[in-house]
């Protein structure tokens, strides 16, 4: 639950936080008895509690498939992220990862904390994967193969251009969107979404994470992880790491705003994808992370704290998003409000101000044209600014 100080400052957070805590305890009690499934669901809650909560609302077969899909890709991502592994060792592993998921004797020790446990005990994930229906297995294998090939390409290549950036994000996140769309379709609950819309769902989340995690990635030991494209950052500094130095704050914020503006191009596709969903559980599963993403972009925009430490939405607001996101009108409301906040933070002297405002106005137009913005809105306070969110 949130800290006492945060709750006293935002007393209306208390009830959503309490509901979230109760839901988390309930989810932990739902862990299956079979050892391999027990490992998978307990690991899911350790690597992503919020994801673990939302996934519990899916139907049993789809829930199992999405759980394993997530853990397989987290394991693959753990190999890619471990900067202590040499390229010569790493590339063959990620290239063959789609084969390893069929081998319940395979494991590879890497990563730290819960991710090391995931890798050391990967046979549990393999056993659970083998329990899935054939259509689910085929979708997971296909996406894992394509993602591994893409990761291998960028292990040996830096992100130079915006096209490189989009391609990298496609491999590590856009393909997740494609895979989830395949799993939703295989379950019989949804029509198969277009690759373009599915890709945008992944890119919006991934670009938000890359922006938010700048400092963590640049300070990675033994080697920095650099995902911001040179085509953007080279307009402001000579080296990507220069953005974290206080003397470069003005240029760093301009670069940050450029990155946020680039991410916003995917928002309208995300709204279209979500508006096409039929199942309430699948809808919430998709919508909650997207609202968190645009909220995080609103918090990061024009904020030097991105280059000084951790920037994230407060836990109470996260609890409200999870509790109150029920329908597409809630999504339109949240996207509209967060785009209003973003718009209020645009400095007309920023070199990308015109482009940023244009993208925000396009998002607002889509939300207004939905015809669902008639409700009033509550105001929530961030440590750094005021955030609006739908009641």
UniProtKB/Swiss-Prot annotation:
InterPro entries: Isoprenoid_synthase_dom_sf, Squ/phyt_synthse, Squal_synth-like, Squalene/phytoene_synthase_CS, Trans_IPPS_euk-type, Trans_IPPS_HH. Its EC number is 2.5.1.21. It comes from the Eukaryota. Pfam families: SQS_PSY. It catalyses: 2 (2E,6E)-farnesyl diphosphate + NADH + H(+) = squalene + 2 diphosphate + NAD(+); 2 (2E,6E)-farnesyl diphosphate + NADPH + H(+) = squalene + 2 diphosphate + NADP(+). Component of the triterpene saponins (e.g. ginsenosides or panaxosides) and phytosterols biosynthetic pathways. Catalyzes the biosynthesis of squalene. This is Squalene synthase 8. Pathway: Terpene metabolism; lanosterol biosynthesis; lanosterol from farnesyl diphosphate: step 1/3. It is an enzyme of class 2 (transferase). GO terms for molecular function: squalene synthase [NAD(P)H] activity. One of its GO terms (cellular component) is endoplasmic reticulum membrane. Keywords: Endoplasmic reticulum, Isoprene biosynthesis, Magnesium, Multifunctional enzyme, NADP, Transferase. Its cofactor is Mg(2+); Mn(2+). Belongs to the phytoene/squalene synthase family. Its main location: endoplasmic reticulum. It is found in: Endoplasmic reticulum. CDD domains: Trans_IPPS_HH. Induction: Induced methyl jasmonate (MeJA) in adventitious roots. Induced by A.niger mycelium-derived elicitor, thus improving ginsenosides production in adventitious roots culture. GO terms for biological process: farnesyl diphosphate metabolic process; isoprenoid biosynthetic process; response to jasmonic acid; response to molecule of fungal origin.
